């Protein structure tokens, strides 16, 4: 009879609820709030992804525009290179022509110097001959005057008249005697030499005039060459300015290439960020993992110290999520490689629906786990002992009146056992935080990190 009383106390103790309804409601409210927060965060991520798509399209258009500009600059550079080649060829030809003209000008200058020396020498000869002619003229005048004086003296003498009558007639009235005829014979070679000198002087003057004309022509050619040289210098300055412009365009092209490389790096960084966002998203459980979780839940239900239904379910799911997240990330990467054309918004939407399904499945697992725990309590309350007296007690149980309300245990052993169980549960709850809290904390930290990365990339774009 005493044994039957102890069995009744054990049954009443096992019939008491092992969890608190408030804890369950608080867990459900917390899960609902977290789901709402995740929905809001999902909307924000959708907006940010749309903005990223718009920015990506703008950057693609800008890259196309820059590529077109690069092609135009490349064509302009090629045209400038062709012009520079032509200018180089023209400059070389002009340098050769300039060298030839310089040599010709030097030769003409030497010739002019020689002709100038010849002119000076001839001018000296002309001066000497002119002085000699003047001297001969003075001598001739003196001789004529002397003859006139002599003729005046002898004009009234008879022999002179006889000589005049007998002498041959001369056209020159002043030459009336033989000595005068000798003077004329001496003057004829002087006149011939004088004529010859006059001819030489006239020829020299003609040569000097011709040389002066040639000199003026050479001076005009030198002036034309100098003008051409100045024009070539101006063209050379223009070519140097064009060369500087080409260097500036090359520097701008290098800057544009560096800017393009930096933008490509930024675009690749944003793609990596999107990939990390997708990889960090939770994945759905496989059926095998669900079975393993249910088996784990059943084993946990048999433990002497039980967790709440949400704690045990989330422990099982988080234990499965460690491998499922890795497999899911690999599967997501493979799907991303196979279906690169799929939109990221669609993937996020699918992940959101998968998260909702996972949440509903979590609630279903909690309910199933609660029912399994109830069945386990009923099963553990029955096989207490294999004594035939217990069978008699079980047969006699339907004949007993309904059980009385539960009473507080009166024995010290029962009190000590209950206190030990309560202390163990408190110690476990104080040491081990629930797994879902750590999971949600990790999710929020990753969301904040992605938001800070997006803001930093936008700040870098704005700074550039």
From Swiss-Prot:
<dbReference type="InterPro" id="IPR026079">
    <property type="entry name" value="CDR2"/>
</dbReference>
<protein>
    <recommendedName>
        <fullName>Cerebellar degeneration-related protein 2-like</fullName>
    </recommendedName>
</protein>
<feature type="region of interest" description="Disordered">
    <location>
        <begin position="371"/>
        <end position="419"/>
    </location>
</feature>
<feature type="compositionally biased region" description="Basic and acidic residues">
    <location>
        <begin position="384"/>
        <end position="395"/>
    </location>
</feature>
<feature type="coiled-coil region">
    <location>
        <begin position="31"/>
        <end position="154"/>
    </location>
</feature>
<comment type="similarity">
    <text>Belongs to the CDR2 family.</text>
</comment>
<feature type="compositionally biased region" description="Pro residues">
    <location>
        <begin position="399"/>
        <end position="409"/>
    </location>
</feature>
<keyword id="KW-0175">Coiled coil</keyword>
<feature type="coiled-coil region">
    <location>
        <begin position="342"/>
        <end position="379"/>
    </location>
</feature>
<feature type="coiled-coil region">
    <location>
        <begin position="201"/>
        <end position="264"/>
    </location>
</feature>
């Amino acid at each position: 009879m005493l044994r039957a009383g102890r069995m009744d106390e054990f049954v009443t103790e096992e019939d008491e609820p092992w969890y608190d309804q408030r804890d369950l409601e608080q867990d459900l409210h917390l899960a609902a709030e977290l789901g709402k927060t995740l929905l809001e965060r999902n909307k924000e991520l959708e907006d940010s992804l749309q903005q990223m798509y718009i920015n990506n399209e703008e950057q693609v258009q800008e890259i196309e525009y820059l590529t077109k500009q690069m092609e135009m600059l490349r064509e302009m550079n090629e045209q400038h290179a062709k012009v520079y080649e032509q200018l180089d060829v023209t400059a070389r030809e002009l340098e050769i022509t300039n060298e030839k003209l310089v040599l010709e000008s030097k030769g003409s200058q030497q010739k002019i110097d020689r002709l100038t020396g010849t002119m000076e020498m001839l001018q000296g000869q002309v001066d000497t001959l002119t002085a000699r002619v003047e001297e001969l003229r003075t001598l001739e005048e003196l001789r004529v005057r002397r003859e006139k004086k002599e003729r005046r003296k002898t004009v009234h003498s008879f022999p002179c008249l006889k000589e005049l009558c007998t002498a041959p007639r001369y056209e020159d009235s002043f030459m009336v005697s033989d000595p005068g005829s000798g003077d004329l014979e001496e003057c004829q070679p002087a006149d011939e030499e004088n004529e010859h000198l006059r001819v030489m002087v006239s020829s020299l003057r003609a040569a000097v005039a011709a040389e002066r004309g040639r000199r003026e022509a050479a001076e005009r050619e030198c002036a034309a060459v100098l003008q051409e040289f100045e024009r070539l210098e101006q063209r050379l300055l223009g070519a140097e300015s064009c060369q500087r412009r080409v260097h500036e365009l090359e520097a701008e092209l290098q800057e544009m290439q560096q800017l393009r490389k930096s933008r490509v790096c930024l675009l690749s960084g944003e793609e990596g960020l999107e990939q990390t966002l997708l990889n960090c998203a939770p994945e759905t459980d496989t059926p095998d993992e669900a079975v393993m979780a249910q088996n784990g839940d059943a084993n946990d239900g048999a433990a002497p110290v039980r967790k709440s239904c949400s704690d045990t379910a989330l422990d099982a799911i988080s234990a499965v999520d460690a491998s499922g997240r890795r497999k899911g990330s690999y599967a997501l990467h493979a799907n991303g490689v196979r279906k690169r054309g799929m939109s990221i918004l669609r993937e996020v939407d699918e992940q959101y629906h998968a998260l909702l399904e996972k949440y509903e499945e979590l609630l279903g697992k909690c309910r199933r786990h609660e029912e399994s725990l109830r069945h386990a309590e009923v099963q553990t309350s029955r096989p207490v002992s294999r004594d035939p007296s217990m069978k008699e007690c079980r047969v006699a149980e339907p004949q007993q009146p309904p059980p009385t309300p539960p009473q507080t245990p009166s024995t010290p052993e029962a009190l000590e056992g209950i206190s030990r169980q309560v202390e163990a549960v408190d110690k476990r709850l104080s040491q081990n935080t629930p797994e879902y809290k750590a999971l949600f904390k990790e999710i929020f930290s990753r969301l904040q990190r992605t938001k800070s990365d997006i803001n930093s990339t936008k700040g870098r774009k704005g700074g550039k």
